[in-house]
Design a protein with these regions (language model features):
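Extracytoplasmic/periplasmic substrate-binding proteins
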Residues: 321-389
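Sec-dependent signal peptide cleavage junction
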Residues: 56-75, 543
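Bacterial N-terminal signal peptides
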Residues: 48-57
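Extracytoplasmic ligand-binding site segments that recognize negatively charged/polar headgroups
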Residues: 89-105, 112-119, 169-339
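Early extracytoplasmic/lumenal segment of secretory-pathway proteins
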Residues: 69, 74-173, 177
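Ligand-binding "clamshell"
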Residues: 174-183, 217-220, 353-368, 444
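Mature extracytoplasmic/periplasmic domains
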Residues: 382-483, 522, 533-536
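Conserved C-terminal helix/tail region of periplasmic/extracytoplasmic solute-binding proteins
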Residues: 458-553
Length: 553
């Protein structure tokens, strides 16, 4: 079975819905809603539902038949049996889309006159919008996965979907395996006012997708972005300085022995190790001034040569001895409770942790390592075996991407899940208005800074229309994590998909680190091992000679 080795798993924890902001986070609390249940709970619920269904089926067959007819009637909304209907099978991360049901006081009244309110689920609103605009009923079957590897294994085991939302490296893997359906030419038509994605995607994100390739094909041919972020160090400023936190070398800083946590996956940990190993090179001003700096940075951070893997293994074994633990999701809670003083974290989860800690009276900050940072994203791709040449289904899939990319819907999803949309909005300033609503300084605040974000919204960081007036502290907190500065973005690199041989090598490295640290073996133990091996060899030789002597005799 062609399964992904879980030692290579990258699991960004499922985001939790929340509200925050310089203007509003001080009074806001975490609002946690669930779109999909965990697998074990889902299976138990499914079993219970099935049992009840079977019992009901035995006791009330006639009523069951009537209910089936009624359900069909409701589903079709009174439509005739001949009316066209498209089924769209979507699979995305758990808790990664607005489920609606907002309270009335949650309505977002933005300065540009837009009111954002999630009454219905995003999926339900899409179904209604699609019918109104295309005259075709669409039935969205929405499923969830917990990790990229879960999704890949689901596909390998035979699950079929039309549209999925994996992370960058899994998109690259699916591209390399020729499993993706290319986006249509119509999807990129900027004259179509329903093409919200191509008309609203951030110029920076668009350029990233159009300049990165797999096997000579750009990401943009197959993928449309959804959410993005960077990695860094979440830390307690009362226990650690910004300079101490702002480098990958903090992970093996003995001053913070057993007070830091690191990600329990090979890709994130390997990236941090390479960043620390290459610190001198990455910090060199001449290197950063080169015209092809970004390309060289990408090559360095994706170096999987035997030498780099070996050096990274040695460093990660040292880091393993220095950190409190490897973790996937517990790091946020450990920071909030004060169990640790720093945590290697994804920006989206860092924002969540800062929000939650603030409710408990704890202030946390976020530092982007000065050497470099990892740019990650999740994006929509269509699966070839799902679309299967069906033009209606492909149109519905692309329409779904466009609908969630509409600026007001991008805001709904950001508000609900807490991550950062790739949508800037183009001529529609709703996203920026939401940013100002969330992080803009109050008129009477004194300690404020100008925070330019033109690189994201227009491609020009000097654009005066996109300079946010924000509380100074937010530069190193939620604002800086959710919308990184241009300086942080310029020293970011995407960690690309590794081929089969490289994946095997770094997975073996990870096994060596997580399961066995050769440096922990004392010298005297090696002498014992050598003596035992020597003794066993002697016994084998003795028996062979004895057997030869006996046979000869």
């Amino acid at each position: 079975m062609n399964e992904v080795n879980n030692s290579n798993a990258l699991h960004r924890s499922a985001p939790l819905a929340k509200q925050r902001g310089a203007k509003h986070y001080r009074e806001g609390g975490a609002m946690i809603r669930h779109r999909c249940f965990g697998r074990s709970i889902s299976r138990k619920l499914a079993a219970a539902v099935m049992a009840v269904s079977l019992l009901a089926g035995q006791m009330l067959p006639v009523m069951a038949a009537e209910d089936t007819g009624n359900a069909a009637s409701v589903k079709n909304n009174g439509a005739s049996a001949t009316e066209k209907e498209v089924t769209l099978r979507v699979c995305s991360w758990e808790e990664y889309i607005d489920e609606g049901g907002w309270d009335e006081d949650e309505a977002l009244e933005l300065d540009n006159g837009t009111t954002i309110f999630g009454e219905n689920s995003m999926v339900e609103d899409f179904e209604n919008w699609y019918y109104e605009n295309y005259g075709v009923k669409v039935n969205v079957q929405y499923s969830c996965f917990g990790t990229n590897e879960d999704l890949y294994n689901m596909l390998t085991l035979g699950d079929v979907y039309d549209l999925v939302c994996p992370s960058e490296y899994m998109i690259m893997k699916l591209m390399s395996e020729n499993k993706l359906e290319p986006l249509s030419d119509d999807f990129f038509d900027e004259n179509n006012d329903k093409n919200y994605y191509i008309n609203g995607v951030s110029p920076y994100i668009r350029d990233t997708f159009e300049t990165h390739e797999i096997n000579g094909e750009t990401w943009s041919k197959y993928a449309a972005g959804f959410m993005f972020g960077i990695t860094g160090i979440l830390y307690n400023p009362e226990k650690m300085t910004a300079d101490e936190a702002g480098t990958w070398t903090v992970l093996n800083n003995p001053k913070f022995s057993k007070q830091i946590t690191i990600k329990d996956n090979v890709r994130d940990s390997y990236f941090a190790a390479v960043g620390a190993l290459q610190r001198d090179k990455l910090m060199d001003t001449e290197f950063r001034a080169q015209d092809d700096y970004s390309e060289q940075l990408k090559d360095i951070m994706n170096d999987v040569s035997p030498e780099t893997i070996a050096k990274s293994q040695d460093l990660l074994q040292d880091i393993k001895d220095n950190v409190y633990s490897f973790e996937t999701d517990s790091g946020k809670a450990d920071m909030i409770t004060g169990k640790v003083v720093a945590n290697y974290q994804w920006s989206g989860d860092a924002v969540y942790a800062m929000d939650q800690a603030e409710e408990d009276g704890v202030k946390l900050d976020f530092a982007v390592p000065e050497e470099c940072t990892n740019l990650y994203f999740d994006g929509w791709v269509m699966l070839k075996n799902g679309i299967d040449g069906d033009a209606d289904r492909k149109q519905a899939a692309e329409a779904f991407i466009n609908f969630v990319s509409r600026p007001d819907n991008a805001v709904r999803n950001m508000y609900y899940i807490g991550y950062t949309s790739v949508i800037a909005g183009g001529d529609d300033d709703t996203v920026y208005s939401y940013l100002d609503y969330t992080y803009g300084a109050e008129d009477d605040e004194e300690d404020v800074v100008d925070y330019p974000l033109g690189y994201f919204f227009t491609g020009d960081n000097s654009d005066p229309d996109y300079v946010l007036r924000a509380p100074a502290e937010q530069v190193n907190r939620q604002l800086g994590a959710q919308y990184p500065s241009q300086d942080a973005i310029e020293r970011s690199a995407v960690m690309e998909y590794f081929d089969e041989d490289a994946t095997k090598d770094i997975n073996q490295m990870w096994i060596n680190i997580r399961c066995y640290n050769i440096k922990d073996v004392p010298i005297w133990a090696w002498f014992i091992v050598a003596a035992v091996i020597g003794a066993l060899a002697g016994v084998i030789v003795y028996h062979k000679r004895s057997k030869k002597f006996y046979l000869g005799k």
